[in-house]
Amino acid sequence: MHKRLFITLLGFIILLAGCDYSKEENQTGIFYNVFVKSMDGFLHFLGRVFQDNYGFAIISIVLIVRFILLPFMLIQVKNMHMMREKTKVVQPELDAIRDKMKHATSQEERNAANQLLMKKYQSYGINPLKNMLGCLPVLIQMPILMGLYMSLKYPSSHGITEYPHFLWFDLTQPDLIMTIIAAIMYFVQPLVNSIHYPKDQRKTYYFMMVFSPIFITYASLHSAAALGLYWSISAAFLIVQMHFAHSHYKKVALHEAKKLKQKLEQNKDNSELLTEES
């Protein structure tokens, strides 16, 4: 996962470095028309809604993006806890099947064991494939973030350039304090999230705790403070979202795992009873 994040952010840096929309003749192409121009227009619309307060306009964009990504995040967190807790209950059975796969002497035996494993996953309500949603929120957010970055770096007139002030800083210029806040938030976010994972699965989050603040600091110091504001609010909102999602779905998963354990014990008792009667 940390390799995926690194490649994504590296691609983000390369793409941003290669785009120059300072000249009107360069303001063409699919990316500019679909993302940059659309984001610029949407930012101006929200700016007018908030009476030329573009700080609130950017915060609104954060909330919209986070609510769009919320279902994917909830599915991922729910599946992670369900898979972890249910797997603990049926681990001996799954290990026995994996042992058959390991010691299979033919491809047919391996395929049969693999099919049996998938059937067990399905019967217990465990779906490992849902973990593939992990990178989807990043992929959805990337074009939005790049469009916002470009619309702030090359803004059209009569918008944020005329009303750039928000709180203590200028939204169109780099701001050291906003950069520090954004870096801190992106250190805290993976730190808080890592608490909900076993120690042997926290390496990714330790990597993010180091790499993310470095990337955010570099990008914020070379960008409009509006981008730092976007990152700060987005990270803060994600911290709250993840905390409540993990707390809720951990309880749900523990309850479902308890029901599964009781069901397996009952089936075992019934099987032993039938054996004795026979």
Swiss-Prot record:
Intracellular or extracellular location(s): Cell membrane
One GO term (biological process): protein transport
Keyword Calcium: no
Membrane association type: Multi-pass membrane protein
Gene Ontology terms, MF aspect: membrane insertase activity
This protein's GO CC annotations: plasma membrane
Membrane spanning stretches: 55-75, 132-152, 176-196, 224-244
Keywords in alphabetical order: Cell membrane, Chaperone, Lipoprotein, Membrane, Palmitate, Protein transport, Signal, Transmembrane, Transmembrane helix, Transport
Signal peptide residues on this chain, from the entry's feature table: 1-18
Primary location class: membrane
A Pfam family the protein falls into: 60KD_IMP
Residues with lipid group (S-diacylglycerol cysteine): C19
Family affiliation: Belongs to the OXA1/ALB3/YidC family. Type 2 subfamily.
Record protein name field: Membrane protein insertase YidC 1
Organism annotation: Staphylococcus epidermidis (strain ATCC 35984 / DSM 28319 / BCRC 17069 / CCUG 31568 / BM 3577 / RP62A)
